[in-house]
Amino acid sequence: MKRTDEAHWRALEGMYVGSPINTSYAPQIEVGHETASIEIEVGDHFFHAAGAIHGSVTWKMLDDASFFAASSLIDDVFVLTTSFTSYLTRPVSEGMLRSVGRVVNRNRSQIVAEAVAYDQAGREVGRGNGIFVRSRMELATIPLYAQ
């Protein structure tokens, strides 16, 4: 049975929040048509020795927002990140970290999406863009999506 767009987006959200890697991030996500927004609370468990979040946290937020913006368009198979370029522009050591992704181009074989990350004050702290492609793994076979 084919899901509606709304049902697909909610299933993607459930898949993301329930993924084991996100246990320590406790993210909130909202997926829409060609868009995704993700928020996490910054905690010192994400910090490097200099007292700010490690760049991998911001990178993950950028990739995830771009990935789910791209995934919003594909309702039959899992999407894969084939490349992702990021720019980390400001350290973050407290508050909320939010990333907003959007699709910027699509053709038969790939989707290009970008994301911008913001600190709690609304300042840009990073940006990135990536190329996303369809995999062969059907979404219906992924338990966290199918729930």
Q: How should these model regions be labeled?
A:
Residues 1-147:
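Terminal targeting signals and extreme-terminal segments of soluble enzymes
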